[in-house]
């Protein structure tokens, strides 16, 4: 799929009509002015409707541009503008999925702008900056945008976001992550700056094992774990090991090298020399296809419970050599949200927006991009309600606020110091646009249910 900026001019009337059909539309309302509530600490967000809104870096009284990088914004030229930053991977290991993530995020704010915006403001994402999935380049990209934005629409990667957290702290810069590290749910780690969404890798790992044991016609006694150390692999592995201990399952091997040191041959070698009933990969899509294919060539087809970043709907596209393997009933994928076709108001709005933009993809990475913005939207709305759209005000709003997503995810209280534990589990299926048939939604197995989520992150 091409980046949104290369899609050309979008027909605004079509988008407006489709959004109206989904219930969108701007309505006028009268708000009684009240005195703003005084906020003393970062843990006490403003919750009153203020007479005026204090603004700072990245917020202007001037309207948003009509387009950014050739992409229409649907901004209201009678309103001010909230600018968001984007730290994406255009040239690194996730370059192939970066366009879908960006497309969905820009589409999300187009929808928000076309249905009333955030108070007296429209919202736009500035041109994305390439991080190459490298922490140092991530910092350089952050520095390139830090004086121009009120918050980050995306900071892709767990180690990368951790690497810039000190700078975000100095700037009171709140951001939506494109990762599901359990630490994002705890102020001891994220300092109240990362607006998390969806279940953590750790919970998905627990639920993956428990669901497989309860639902599949395989007696799972031994398992293997592979992933990227220091990235999502560690969080995922710790969840699986906790569930394995609870269930009396033997972890025969773990292969968790740093991201750039992952060796497909070594991973396949472990599967050959130490066969297991099931393995749990938390790698990138490229490594996933190579590992699964390599094991298959050796006559091995154990159950595979893939972490969300491991799966790509391209695995079940017509013409892909491993399509039969991924659809064989031995491969399953985890997610923090239901796939593209799900029946929720949020999914319907997303589909309508993507279709109006001329997109025919149902990629899970579109869902990832879209879902990542809901909680940030809730934070900005709370900041406006509190009368403070400075970065400090946005940070206060993120410290303790209920956020919802029109049914895409469960309502969540940010700042609760407790990670979400509900997972979605699917089966690769090329007959469906998203490439996934949903088998279980908001699933919580016995391990995740018994785990002390108030005790801090899993890794």
Task: Explain the meaning of each model-derived region.
Residues 18-21:
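C-terminal motif of bacterial Sec signal peptides marking the signal peptidase cleavage site
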Residues 23-26:
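Bacterial signal peptide processing site
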Residues 42-75, 80-82, 401-459:
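Solvent-exposed, acidic/polar segments of extracytosolic/periplasmic ligand-binding ectodomains
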Residues 60, 67-79, 85-106, 128-135, ...:
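Extracytoplasmic "Venus flytrap"
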Residues 69, 96-103, 115-188, 197, ...:
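Beta-alpha junction/loop-to-helix N-cap segments that form part of ligand/metal-binding clefts
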Residues 69-70, 149-255, 303-328:
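Extracytoplasmic ligand/sensor domains, especially the bilobed periplasmic-binding protein
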Residues 229, 237-241, 285, 290, ...:
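Extracellular/periplasmic ligand-binding modules, especially the Venus flytrap/periplasmic-binding
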Residues 295-370, 455-458:
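Extracellular/periplasmic periplasmic-binding protein-like sensory domains
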